């Protein structure tokens, strides 16, 4: 007996869960090299700072291709689109696992980045769309939990597997799990015709929304600040803090677990204190980055800082994602494609800046440089919050139509 697809209107936690699991896979593969920089470098006789450029290339391909790929696929039914995306994802990971050179590894990562560009352009809006009525914030929180679990389980387990069996095994394992996720998505998601995806004609309208432009600028600054330090947390903990490989893995676990706590905080307070939550998150992140070096010699203090840091960056990312969706309800996919692209500009910029700092000033200073940049983001956030006052996205959208 053939069963019909789930009913989109009824809302589906299973569908949201499937998207969260897919988010787990995508975030695992984007950031798992952070825990494997040294291992990959040994295979190709490169330094961690040189290998770290693969993070920059990946992120910048995503940033450049998010909008073009979203526009190219805007009329494709979303469930079918996700099947194609994961097909490319799996094939590219197999290529990563058998790469005979760093250049081929980069080519495989570009293929994964193309899949990433499409996935994150549509996923947040899909999660909101298929969530049970009145549960949109919780759906975003569950999606964020998938992201956090990538930090809690994906990256540390990828590091453990890479150290035990080689980094190639890590990428092969990701390909296998992704193949299972494809099956779950096919079973759990309803048919999802493209809806409110927008087009190139949406861009001038979005660019006329100053609140949205401020969010994009803030995203670029703060994400760059964060990844200036986080991209090189493995060499930092091992060379500056003098922690063992096992302790470094535990620290990555702690960071990811804190991200889950951050998503819970977002779910509880985002509706009541949107501005306060955002300012607090950026301020906390700034302090954590600036204190990274001073506290690096005390494992307990460094662990505590890592917990606070993980909560702060998760609250920041979720708050901005929710605001983008609320400020562009008429072109959600275009707006989220821009957000994903700009977020990845920050990831790539942070990885590049961290590489420069590591090479010229020493890896010990990545937190200081990132913290100073985050301080600028905090100033921008305070200014825009005061300037725009209470955010009323619906009123802004209605004003544009007059």
Curated annotation (Swiss-Prot):
<feature type="transmembrane region" description="Helical">
    <location>
        <begin position="213"/>
        <end position="233"/>
    </location>
</feature>
<keyword id="KW-0997">Cell inner membrane</keyword>
<feature type="transmembrane region" description="Helical">
    <location>
        <begin position="84"/>
        <end position="104"/>
    </location>
</feature>
<dbReference type="InterPro" id="IPR011701">
    <property type="entry name" value="MFS"/>
</dbReference>
<comment type="function">
    <text>Involved in the efflux of sugars. The physiological role may be the reduction of the intracellular concentration of toxic sugars or sugar metabolites.</text>
</comment>
<feature type="transmembrane region" description="Helical">
    <location>
        <begin position="14"/>
        <end position="34"/>
    </location>
</feature>
<feature type="transmembrane region" description="Helical">
    <location>
        <begin position="276"/>
        <end position="296"/>
    </location>
</feature>
<comment type="similarity">
    <text>Belongs to the major facilitator superfamily. SotB (TC 2.A.1.2) family.</text>
</comment>
<keyword id="KW-1133">Transmembrane helix</keyword>
<dbReference type="Pfam" id="PF07690">
    <property type="entry name" value="MFS_1"/>
</dbReference>
<dbReference type="InterPro" id="IPR050189">
    <property type="entry name" value="MFS_Efflux_Transporters"/>
</dbReference>
<feature type="transmembrane region" description="Helical">
    <location>
        <begin position="249"/>
        <end position="269"/>
    </location>
</feature>
<keyword id="KW-0812">Transmembrane</keyword>
<feature type="transmembrane region" description="Helical">
    <location>
        <begin position="361"/>
        <end position="381"/>
    </location>
</feature>
<dbReference type="GO" id="GO:0005886">
    <property type="term" value="C:plasma membrane"/>
</dbReference>
<keyword id="KW-0762">Sugar transport</keyword>
<feature type="transmembrane region" description="Helical">
    <location>
        <begin position="171"/>
        <end position="191"/>
    </location>
</feature>
<feature type="transmembrane region" description="Helical">
    <location>
        <begin position="334"/>
        <end position="354"/>
    </location>
</feature>
<protein>
    <recommendedName>
        <fullName>Probable sugar efflux transporter</fullName>
    </recommendedName>
</protein>
<feature type="transmembrane region" description="Helical">
    <location>
        <begin position="51"/>
        <end position="71"/>
    </location>
</feature>
<keyword id="KW-0472">Membrane</keyword>
<keyword id="KW-0813">Transport</keyword>
<feature type="transmembrane region" description="Helical">
    <location>
        <begin position="137"/>
        <end position="157"/>
    </location>
</feature>
<dbReference type="InterPro" id="IPR020846">
    <property type="entry name" value="MFS_dom"/>
</dbReference>
<feature type="transmembrane region" description="Helical">
    <location>
        <begin position="110"/>
        <end position="130"/>
    </location>
</feature>
<dbReference type="InterPro" id="IPR023495">
    <property type="entry name" value="Sugar_effux_transptr_put"/>
</dbReference>
<feature type="transmembrane region" description="Helical">
    <location>
        <begin position="300"/>
        <end position="320"/>
    </location>
</feature>
<dbReference type="InterPro" id="IPR036259">
    <property type="entry name" value="MFS_trans_sf"/>
</dbReference>
<keyword id="KW-1003">Cell membrane</keyword>
<dbReference type="GO" id="GO:0015144">
    <property type="term" value="F:carbohydrate transmembrane transporter activity"/>
</dbReference>
